[in-house]
């Protein structure tokens, strides 16, 4: 701005100088033309005037010497022209009278020049002022620019801080979600611990009450022992008096026989004396009978005390189970040796003594059955006191009718109590087994009596040897009955079933076997194995036995109470019979009777009709029309080759041949597996669950069942037109989930449960529909329908390392530019699958040959080259072994039993273990079962007592106790 103003000012001044110079030159003009006119003739002379003025100015400035020197340098011609010109008198055509006009004009121009100079000075001042303002404005502009830059920097910092805050917010939200999950898990654990503590507190209170009762019973026992000791002393004195009286009676009888002929009067006196002595003996016998009643009462009290004492001893023996068991058994043995030997040997011999003892038994027996489950079960574990009683020195014989009636009364009481206890809900099976032990023990106590010695008196009835029980009698009945006894106990331990559980038929059969153990073992085994002869039973015993059989007849509710499988006949169908509605309620249960009868017969001996019906059950009934004439028996299928199946039966489908071969192998194997129970209809529903319903037609045509899923190969899937890599991996992980859950039919989760406590093990069981529900719960409902038919389920999400968030986002069709949505999906996906699965997926992504899993990737079948054509058969065999899901996947975790909470590792007895128990010898099996039963009761007691009962119970497996008992046998 300033430079432009300066230029304008300089141009104006130059113009003014030119105007002034032009006005001076007009004095020499003739006034005809204006000097400013472009056609003026003075434009060339104006220059000459300027040159002359310049010359004058220069000459005035020069000195004389310089002037002389300059003049010498001027050419002569130039000097002559100048002199001639200067001496000319012409006025250049101007009249002398026009000089005033030019003078006025010159004055006016001078005035204009001065005014212009003033204007120029004013303009200069204005220009300077404007320059100052311009400088101020430029300074303000710089300040505003600096402020703008500072504001932009602050804006950038604010954007960076906001981005970091957003990231921190997402991290905090993820942390809050983790904390919520942890809080839910902790809350669940707290509730579990509270429930466990509440149960434990009640059990501890019950144990304390039992201890108080034991202390009270201990005091009563001491009193009873004192009474028993005094009663024994009195009994000994009475026996001595009785011996003396017997000897005296014998002596008097001998004298009476010798002197009857000669001494008639003395005979009469002696008869009177004998009558008096007989009356005295009768009074002694009445007193003896009263003592016997007291002894029987003491014996009943001691038996109840022993039943109450044994569980307390087991509960107090927490530090050493074996010591507690030995202590309880030694106490019972000591009581039997000290208190029961003389009692059983001093049983009354009069006929009237049977009914009072039975009445006393009937009055005291109901009190025995008011004990708890543990109290009722433990006495059956202890060694019977029969051997100890027989080892003592008996003094009095036992009347047969009395002992038999007493045993029958006890048997009836045991059976009646067993019937009343069978209506319980949670402990029915345990009570049945315990009542069985009581029944057997009381029967042995009532019937197995010791023989008398040589000091028996003649007035007492003679000994009947037939009622002496053999030492080798099996207290658990036959081997089959014992196995059912063991199975009942193991089923009690293994599950939480109640008496109303769906397994009805087996429960009834088990109940009847338990009830009839005493009868079957005595009727079949005792007659052949007892070394002592059996006397014919009395009429009273026959009545009692018929009463027992009548009682068992009332208990028989269905045909499952039959004990001999050969005697079972197929009943004809009738409506309204027992268990008419059991089939629909059992769900997955099969026809137990038919399956058992089929398994009893080898498949090679099956008839043609059985084989055909079996093929129809397998879904291969379409081949019966062409191959029915070829099938003779089961042996035909067992010996058939691939060519025979294809030629004779017309099975062209390779999967049908494989299905038949696997089914035949399963029939030949003794192992019972759950995948053999899943038919092809279940597999089609399973395809819906894992999100692959498009293959239902192919799987249904191939009759793919659970066994074929377990042994499914890659070639099998390719033959079923499954060529997608993603679908192969989906089926692979779905089979692995089935193995982990032991091929349970309903292991997959189709509906949401508790969203706050989801674990990766539960996510493994999610179906495709459940995954879509999860997407809706995390605000991705608009993308959830894209998973239909994709094969995405919980097992694929958790177990497959190649399946990650990127694959999930591609399957959901989330665009790559929606980074917030993908980040949101990644956050919830990682929270869902857990840290371990995240680590596996991260390791898989770091591998050098990692390729992102997509829905378009295809499985390339292996091709055989001509170089390997010679080993074609070998190659086919090796390729056939390439399973979709390798056998090692899911086996380790699949062996664990389901149905228990985490942390409760309870070992269940399998069928092989029970069959192994059945194959034991009689004596060894009895001892081992008693040991296992006692060990199980000990473990249950410790579970109820200790705070960490679940972990301790896992450490004390019943199998270890059986092994210890085997080593001690």
UniProtKB/Swiss-Prot annotation:
Organism (species): Mus musculus
Residue ranges the record marks as coiled coil: 99-310
CDD domains: SAM_liprin-beta1_2_repeat1, SAM_liprin-beta1_2_repeat2, SAM_liprin-beta1_2_repeat3
GO BP: cortical microtubule organization
Any one GO CC term of the record: cell cortex
Entry superkingdom: Eukaryota
PROSITE patterns associated with the record: SAM_DOMAIN
Family (UniProt): Belongs to the liprin family. Liprin-beta subfamily.
Region (Disordered): 342-361, 381-407, 424-482, 518-593
Keyword Signal: no
Alphabetically ordered keywords of this record: Acetylation, Coiled coil, Cytoplasm, Isopeptide bond, Phosphoprotein, Repeat, Ubl conjugation
Subunit structure: Forms homodimers and heterodimers. Interacts with S100A4 in a Ca(2+)-dependent mode. Part of a cortical microtubule stabilization complex (CMSC) composed of KANK1, PPFIA1, PPFIBP1, ERC1/ELKS, PHLDB2/LL5beta, CLASPs, KIF21A and possibly additional interactors; within CMSCs KANK1 and PHLDB2/LL5beta seem to be the core components for recruiting microtubule-binding proteins KIF21A and CLASPs, whereas PPFIA1, PPFIBP1 and ERC1/ELKS serve as scaffolds for protein clustering. Interacts with KANK1 (via CC1 domain, residues 244-339).
Residue ranges, compositional bias (Basic and acidic residues): 439-452
Modified sites of kind N6-acetyllysine: 291
Domain note: The N-terminal coiled coil regions mediate homodimerization preferentially and heterodimerization type beta/beta. The C-terminal, non-coiled coil regions mediate heterodimerization type beta/alpha and interaction with S100A4.
Protein function: May regulate the disassembly of focal adhesions. Did not bind receptor-like tyrosine phosphatases type 2A.
Main location: cytoplasm
Official protein name in the record: Liprin-beta-1
Domain SAM: 606-670, 678-741, 763-835
Biased composition (Basic residues): 543-557
